[in-house]
UniProtKB/Swiss-Prot annotation:
Subcellular location: Endoplasmic reticulum membrane
Domain comment (free text): EF-hand domain is involved in the detection of calcium concentration.
Protein known as: Mechanosensitive ion channel protein Msy1
Species of provenance: Schizosaccharomyces pombe (strain 972 / ATCC 24843)
Assigned protein family: Belongs to the MscS (TC 1.A.23) family.
Underlying gene: msy1
Keywords, comma-separated and alphabetical: Calcium, Calcium channel, Calcium transport, Endoplasmic reticulum, Ion channel, Ion transport, Membrane, Phosphoprotein, Stress response, Transmembrane, Transmembrane helix, Transport
Residue numbers on the Cytoplasmic membrane side: 1-223, 309-319, 388-595, 655-1011
Residue spans of biased composition, Basic residues class: 143-161
Gene Ontology CC terms, in alphabetical order: endoplasmic reticulum; endoplasmic reticulum membrane; membrane; perinuclear endoplasmic reticulum
Topology of the protein relative to the lipid bilayer: Multi-pass membrane protein
Amino acid sequence: MSSPTSPTSSPGRHHWSNSKDGMPPEYTNQDPNSDQADNENSDAKAHQPQHSPQHSTENQGHTGTSDTSSLEMELSKLHPESKQRQLPHSPEHERSRSPIASVVSYRSHMTLEDENQIFNAEMAVRGSQSLQRRPTGRSVRGSMRRLSSHRSKSMRTSKSKKSGDYERTAENEEAAQEAENHLDNFGVVTFGTEAPIKAPDHPVTIFGRIFKFIQQRSFYLRSLIYIIPLGVLLLIPVFIGRFYHPQPPYRDELGHEYERHLHVGGVDLMWMAIWWEIIWLSIWAARYAAKVIPYFFAFFVSFISNNVTKWRCMAVALEFPITLFLWMLAVYVSFLPIMTRRHIGDYGVPDHVRVKLPWQQSANNVLITLFITSIMNLVEKVLMQLIAMSLHRREYESRILYNKFAINELARLYGYARQRSFDFKDAIHRAQADVFKFADHQHGKKRAAAARVAQNALNKTTYKAISAFNFATDMVNKVAGEITNREVEKSSSPKSVVLHLLKTTRGCQSLARCLFEALVNPENPDLVLDDFIPVYTDETGEVDNATLEACYSIFDRDLNGDITCEEIELACVEIGKERKSISASLRDLNDSISKLDGICMFIVAVITLFIFLYLIARNFSGVLTSAGTTLLGLSWLFSGSAQELLSSIIFVFVKHPYDVGDRVDVMINGTVTSAMVKEISIMSTEFRLLTGKVIQAPNSLLNTLWILNMRRSDGIADPVTVNLKFGTTLQQIEQLRIKIIDFLKEEKRDYKPDLLTEVTDLPDLYSMSLCVVFFHKYNFQDEVLRMRRRNMFMCALMTYMQELDIVSPIFNSPGKSKDSPMYVNFNNGSMEGVKLSGGNDGGGTENHRDSTVGGGILKNPKAYPYREPTPPGSSDSDTASVSKKRVDFSLGTRHLMPAFDDVADIGSKRLGRDSLPDAVIENAGTEAMRREAEERRRAEEEEYERSQQESSSNEENENASRTSGARFSFSSKASRLSARPSARTVPPLQHISIQDLREPNENNTSKSARL
């Protein structure tokens, strides 16, 4: 909702000076710019929404009104009067203001909807979402928005779907948390190549419920639940083989007795069962080892790398491949020693002969194949992680660093604003407590008193449990942060509120207006750098200038020195969109890498098959020849698909010309198509056209096209070509340039103060094509802003051309103007009474021919922009002297030549970590990045100190040379020759100073005489 603007204010600027008696506008939901605002002011005051969980109805009676009034009183007592600039208390203002609006700053740009958005975010981060999902637990903001009847009906009729909505909301929260982890752990991309086994959302059978219950437990408890039952079952054959002997002992020829053992495939049953037990326990031992390996790996990597977190996260992502490798290693190593050393003879007696039975040889070949497969799988996963990390570092590291820094600074500013203007902590607790006083109404019917009391008690218990859980979570995070030396955000921290507000465009605008309201000076309509100093001043009074300037540059993109409320809104919206774009890009990148991983796994499976055939086949060469012949014969079938796949892989992972959310211009068949990147996959890309249509294009085709990425572009030049009348004077063109440049300087927030004009063509001496090139300060990523800026320029251009009487070439046609009359030739003779404009002597025709055809534009007095028309009676010499004055035929482009030198842009790199300020890296970077920034700053400081010392020593030497030079002088001949280099050695006591060389010869002579 826009704020009222004064008639003298520029468009898009927030002013409140048009209100009566210099007072700010009243807080209503009406648009201040609408014509009906004054007429409906009284109705808006009468229907002002209150802070209550439901609208007042006749069924609620006097209780709801009293509770709402008490809630308003509680909300109005949040801050002392010394910390706020409240509006004057009057009955009219009291009726028009909400309880939260009463504590808003004096020059408020915030509306009631903005306050609702912030209050909504504060409620959400404090764990009240579970109460909001319940019909009786609606928050205070529900009534403030006056829900429509359709929404109220849908909420009443959806009670049977609450459980399903809860599950979907939980899934969305998990997805949001995963995206948050992707943004936090930059430098590492974890892709889900091994999806965990998930239980159904709504299990029907008892076994499904049990499995879901087990899957929801922690890993260690879940592993014990799985290990113990099956491990105990596998111990049964071990005890049977050890203690149970159904047959009598065997006696050999010498009379020795041997116990007969049960055997399976010639191997003792006990040892066979032990090997089965090893198979089961080794998989969990490998899983536990994979959990511990990242910490040991990080310890050893810390000796050679500073970025330990990245490699530890990589080892965590490789948990499943490492588990598979260790498991197959244990199974393969334990198979042959157990099977060959525990052989049972023909009579069931161990013969202690190491014999490899045929089935054991075949099983060993299978285990070898699986072990090699696990090795190839681990190597393939490591390569995929390295590719993902390299692509992530190249494309997203700088964007994530800058976005995290911007969010951290927004959180700092919001924390300052919350302490300064409106702290909702007490209001939220009271509001949540008052919410429980209202009973739920189902289809307009009241529940029984006992049910209402029970429901209120349940809600209170739930609220207390949530508060206790949040408190316990904050305490655990605090202890964990002290142990790990890391700062952990609280559940109700300003950053959590900022992240919640950045999810929607409306929340971004509310956050921006809140920050502007808290920082702006009452005497200045805009923000300046000094307004941010209280936020970045520590307890000792020192100001963090580096972080302050970096934060100020987030909002002051045009570098004009001040920040308007609109600029903060655009910056916050851009930060929110950038965060969503990065999350979507990382998600699509993970999907693409997962598909590439699937392709590589198919290749690994083919290699595994050939290895297995090599181990079991007697004639492997024949099998390989047959397979090669078949593959060659079917090459025509999948050759095109293989080529398309290779082109797509190169396009996505090597070229990577765009990311999700980028606006691109693709040239297809000579036609430029503008679209927004919606989704990127390994084989195709989905675009959303500006018309709303969604199209899909294969990456193999896009690999051969020209693609213009608007987001990666800087300020863009926008040419406009206009056709003017032939004979348009240079004075008119110069005046047009001056007016347009003044317009660009006035609108310096959107345009650069540079203008290029070029006469491109003079077709048939009938018209003149003038190309006007102006420069935007931003790119064309936002189509709405591009249209707005171009419309402003086009309207200004049209207005100035109309003021200067610059017309279309159609006015050169006969009869269109007085300068180009239309002559009519009658075959029957001339018309009587018609007199030519040149007179009877025909001199007028000759003069007209001389002034237009013979003289041309250079002899036309109007063509000279810097001279007055030649007065009558002046001599030809005066006219010739005036005609010798220079005319700027470059149309103002001469002074712009050095400014548009494109040589410096050739070979320049994109925005990387080196181009980011140190404050951004220290605030949002990893520990390794912070150390690099500190080392770089330390090196710069040492270099600066060294240069200062050298400069001071040079000054001392120069002063010494001047002092010694005053005692010695040379003759005029020597002074003239002293400027040339000499091969002779200078005496040690003679010093030549520049001051001596610049003195006149007579001074040198007098000095030498005195010496």
